[in-house]
Amino acid sequence: MFRLTQYMHQLLDPSPPRRRSRPDAVRPVVIWNLTRSCNLKCRHCYTVSADRPFPGELSHDQAMAVLRDLSDFRIPALILSGGEPMSRFDFWELAEEARRLDFRHLSLSTNGTKIDAGNVERLAGLGFDYVGISLDGIGAVNDWFRGVEGAFDQALAGVRACKAQGVKVGLRFTITEGNAHHLPAMLDLCRDEGVDKFYLSHLVYAGRGDKHRGEDTEHARTRRAMDLLIARAWQAVERGEPLEVVTGNNDADAVYFLRWAETRFAPAAVAHLRAHLQAWGGNSSGLGVGNIDPQGRVHPDTYWSDYTLGSVKERPFSAIWTGDDPILATLRTRPRPLKGRCGACAYQAVCGGNTRIRALQLTGDPWAEDPACYLSGSEIGAEGADLDRLAVTPFRGKSHDPAHRFL
């Protein structure tokens, strides 16, 4: 996640950067997909969820054991996700246990349609540090994107219910060619509803998102969206407004913002910003982020579903994460063994090579270039790198064997 607002504040009120610990000492933010079941049918769903039960998901006892292990492992944050996490049969019990174990940060990632007047007080009482609700446009655009008529109104009611109870709530918007025109209205909605955070997510080629990868935004449209997002975020910072703006799944955003700063601030301020961005390091799959899927399989992040590090049904997450898996070790290497224009990029220390899954899905090689980088070769210090760019081709099945070890 690229915390745009946070880095804007570094330009106005600088503080020393804090570098990451040694890779073997880093504890990951864990995104736990509690269930694959979901009452919506989103076009970009990386878990290919549906409104039905799925076999093999963790039992209640297994899930409770996972919580205890994660607590003992001292992870910095736990995000309960899905599917729709509130669809899981024991969601409330798991959430209560997570709060009892006193995780440093506990978040809920939900479609918002199941939050209502009948349960929001209970949700607020659990003390979630943050509730993220997905909306992919206004009204019918969101409902088309999410596959169920009325989903927008239900999710917005969930946002309002959370705000009424004092719960910190944010909106997550996945941008595509089909809904990019709604970005201004989504930002207006955040302002009008007093939403605490806006998360712009770029499309990742996983699950249904891979099948619909042809709907990914063209580079020119992505740039226009980022121009708008930066302008609105900067306006909020200058006015002292509380809205936090972040982006995800395209770490080229950090490079784009750095270049924005270069045209507006003194060299010393830009150098300070770059030091902070390099301390952050960009893509954190397998290092600062880890994933447990509904069946208990552990992955480098939520989009690496084809690559399993182990199962919490057989070994604790803590043991799997501190094991000697070769892909995990390579993901933690800096610089990563990147190829193509990513390998030639002068900003590897800022973006970390971006989202490796897009490269994997298109080429079968997780270290190939990420086609979603929207900066030109000259902008990334790689003249000529645009002559033979990796193209986003229509989905015709996987270009790699999911059992392949990617070595």
Curated annotation (Swiss-Prot):
Annotated GO biological processes are:
heme biosynthetic process
Database matches in InterPro entries: Aldolase_TIM, Elp3/MiaA/NifB-like_rSAM, HemeD1_Synth_NirJ, PqqE-like, Radical_SAM_PqqE_MftC-like, rSAM
**Molecular function per GO:** 4 iron, 4 sulfur cluster binding; catalytic activity; metal ion binding
Q: Which UniProt keywords apply?
A: 4Fe-4S, Iron, Iron-sulfur, Metal-binding, S-adenosyl-L-methionine
Query: What are the boundaries of the signal sequence?
Result: none
- Where [4Fe-4S] cluster 2 is bound, by residue? 342, 345, 351, 373
- Enumerate the SUPFAM superfamilies for this protein: Radical SAM enzymes (SSF102114)
Report the pathway entry.
Porphyrin-containing compound metabolism
The annotation note on the cofactor reads:
Binds 2 [4Fe-4S] clusters per subunit.
Any idea where the Radical SAM core domain is? 24-236
Which top-level group of life is the source organism from?
Bacteria
Q: What are the binding positions for [4Fe-4S] cluster 1 in this chain?
A: 38, 42, 45
List, separated by semicolons, the cofactors it needs: [4Fe-4S] cluster
The entry assigns this protein to a family as follows:
Belongs to the radical SAM superfamily.
What does it do? Involved in heme d1 biosynthesis. Radical SAM enzyme that catalyzes the removal of two propionate side chains from the intermediate 12,18-didecarboxysiroheme (DDSH) and may introduce the keto functions on rings A and B, yielding the heme d1 precursor dihydro-heme d1.
Self-association state and partner proteins as the record states: Monomer.
- Name of the featured protein: Pre-heme d1 synthase
* Protein source organism: Paracoccus pantotrophus (Thiosphaera pantotropha)
The opening ranks of the lineage are: Bacteria, Pseudomonadati, Pseudomonadota, Alphaproteobacteria, Rhodobacterales
Which gene is the coding source of this polypeptide chain?
A: nirJ
